[in-house]
Curated annotation (Swiss-Prot):
Protein name: Transcription termination factor 3, mitochondrial
Listed InterPro entries: MTERF, MTERF_sf
Coiled-coil stretches: none
Pfam family, one: mTERF
Organism from which the protein derives: Rattus norvegicus
Domain comment in the entry: Contains seven structural repeats of about 35 residues, where each repeat contains three helices. The repeats form a superhelical structure with a solenoid shape.
Amino acid sequence: MALLAQQLSRWFNSVKLSSFIKATQVTKHSAGLGKNASAQALLSSDTCFLQWGIKTDRALFSWSSFQSANTTRRKSSTNSTLLPSVSEQPEKIPRLESELPLEELDDLPPLSPLQPVSEEEAIQIAAYSPLPLSSSTLADYVDHSETLQKLVQLGVDLSKIEKHPDVANLLLRLNFEKDIKQILLFLKDLGLEDNQLGPFLTKNYAIFSEDLENLKTRVAYLQSKNFSKTDIACMVKNAPFLLSFSVERLDNRLGFFQKELELSVKKTRDLVVRLPRLLTGSLEPVKENMKVYRLELGFKHNEIQHMVTKIPKMLTANKRKLTETFDYVHNVMNIPHHIIVKFPQVFNTRVFKIKERHLFLAYLGKAQYDPAKPNYVSLDKFVSFPDEVFCKEIAKASVNDFEKFLKTL
């Protein structure tokens, strides 16, 4: 038994010596990394080996564990004298930005992504959200697009533009300085104010796909028709799509209204300045209303001409509303055509409001609309006055009386 223990002790010591020799070779190979690192690597390797050996042979040699442990400590103590002390003062590492030569920077190992950073460095790290590959809203791209950021600052409503995917994709491809800035300067030259650019671009988002020279050509055409700069600015503001129409189409529209209504050039120009969407909207409602005035309501051509030049919206008004208003004013209130022609603004008034006021005047015995008789009630004042003035000037009653009467209807 003593012989067996002696043989095992020699075997264990030979294994330790082999480990030490290998560790010494590793130390020589890693000398460029520094003495401390070599010592730590060797000690770590040796410790791992010892732990493995202890874990494997504990059951077999438990009777000699105490003796082996003492032998191991003596060997470790002897071997440690051959290695640099771990407790030695570490060498000073040169600062990269000042002491390390530039030609040696390429030889430095790359920084590990797991390397700890200080709080100051962490604050300076900019974290950007990833750009979505696809999205149904432009809001996801605002942080990544200077163009969208500038448009938002101008007051453009991106939620309305994103309903049109083709236009939304176009905006994402445009460069603000190269593609959009020149159009903004062009609109400013036309007379649009800064606070008007956002609403304009929200409605006519397609202007970004227009060639700037074509836009200038259309403005030049309007100027050739004696539209002033103020007129053009007003028309563009109230009908944003105006500049998207070709010169040929603009010319055809002006010709249509001049011919259909038999207006002079000046009256035609005044008509479209007051309602510029006549040049951009559909002509079908206009043609339909012209037939209604002539065939259903019984107005003469010159009467229609007079009314639409005074109230241009009559050309695009809802057909049903027109007929209901005329029916009540003409057949219930007994107002003839020639008086309606003088006060066409009655067609801009809600039928419900006309009914309420007429019934209140009839209740008071003051519903008299014939200018040739006493106590005449002007149709103009009848529809244009607010309730307070209507009650005081026309009905000669209080607003409270008017409200009480309305509750009885």
